[in-house]
Amino acid sequence: MSFLKLFKQFVVTGFNKKLLFLSETTCWSYEIQPDLPLEKCRPKKYFDADSDSDEESTQQPQKPPTNGNGTADNVQIVALEVHEGKSLLAVATSDKSLFLFAIDPEGDETNKDRLKLLSRRMVSRTSSCMKFAASGKFLVVCDKGGDCYRYDCDDDDCKKPGRWLLGHMSQVLDVLVPDNERFIITSDRDEKIRVTNHPDCHSIETFCLGHGEFVSQLEFVTAKDGKSRLLSLSGDKTLRLWDYETGKEVARKELSHPGNRFAVKQLLDGTLLVAVLFYEPTEMAIYKLTEVESLTSETIQTLKTNQNEVFSSFAFDERNNLLSLVVDKVTEKISLKWYQFEQENCKFNDLTPNPLEKLFFDNTENDKISYVDSVSFLFKKKFDNLKDYQERKRRRIVEGGKYNYGGRM
């Protein structure tokens, strides 16, 4: 797995155990150490989430978790988020750890002061997604079991255990927190988008229902009336717009293939640029949405990878350029692509070579990353039980015919 985020003038990438901060002139790296100190408190489950007692305070300090085979050698980054306002970086790893760092890009050249570890806390299961609240006061972490936890990020609370917020019956694939922090919005493998009140998460505000397959990603967009809407992407080949406070579907756009991930950039005139990565991650379609409320759009470009390569993580920068990590499935090499936005013709040009690409290559030349198909298993499994029943019935009739009239044939 690999991740790409933007933080001020830096492009932040994460894969294996490695973090890279890149600008056009500099690059510095950090490697997650599995033996870093671990807070002794476990996350509070649903049955004690409302309790203020620190029932874990008497426990012995926890041993660093492992990857399941007794070692921490193969620990990998499974989720990554940044908060620009508070200069925070959150990293979840495969050993069920949540690292919270303070970022100081002006630190010394040894990188020791550029990333300061604030805490390493435990999560109940392997994380599937996470998001910072707009204020940066807390982080919502969701796991593959369907549970969502709140982890405080303020200086005084950043070492406290996670507190259970809500749960789904299936894997949570994405989570959002609006600016007013009134809701926690989650999507899951079972086609549902759930809008839960916050902090009273026992109360569900509404569901946004209509997708026929897993809902892989969510994003807020702003309509012309200034109201916030919810954009969702699904494996049912649709992109949908919702009034998430009422659960009403506002508009939908049919896609040519099941959706995997997307990136959204809203221009000053209200136009949306939406880059959609399909189920087969060798193609990325870029749409220009001129009317947000109706999802009126045109396909302005389709980007394709070279042979054996697949798009991984991608994002728009502040200049509307598109940045993407690309993985070669054969050589297991990872590279960074930079597509420059040409506003006059509304298209993206592949800038190869470019300073970012070279810096990334120089700092990852000896790294390898295995490509993992994380989408196929999300589709609903279909079983044709009727056909099996009819076949068994036919066999019984054929076999029963041998003993008609009480005699042998």
From Swiss-Prot:
Keyword Repeat: yes
GO CC terms in record: cytosol; nucleus; tRNA methyltransferase complex
WD repeat windows: 72-111, 122-161, 167-206, 210-252
Localization of this protein: Nucleus
Protein keywords: Nucleus, Repeat, tRNA processing, WD repeat
Pathway the protein acts in: tRNA modification; N(7)-methylguanine-tRNA biosynthesis
Start-end of Polar residues biased regions: 58-72
Biological process per Gene Ontology, one example term: tRNA (guanine-N7)-methylation
Gene3D superfamilies to which the protein is assigned, alphabetical: YVTN repeat-like/Quinoprotein amine dehydrogenase
Signal peptide annotation: none
Ranges where the record places region Disordered: 48-72
Function: Required for the formation of N(7)-methylguanine at position 46 (m7G46) in tRNA. In the complex, it is required to stabilize and induce conformational changes of the catalytic subunit.
PANTHER family: TRNA (GUANINE-N(7)-)-METHYLTRANSFERASE NON-CATALYTIC SUBUNIT WDR4, WD40 REPEAT PROTEIN 4
Family according to the record: Belongs to the WD repeat TRM82 family.
HAMAP family in UniProt: TRM82
Subunit relationships: Forms a heterodimer with the catalytic subunit.
Protein name (Swiss-Prot/TrEMBL): tRNA (guanine-N(7)-)-methyltransferase non-catalytic subunit wuho
Organism: Aedes aegypti (Yellowfever mosquito)
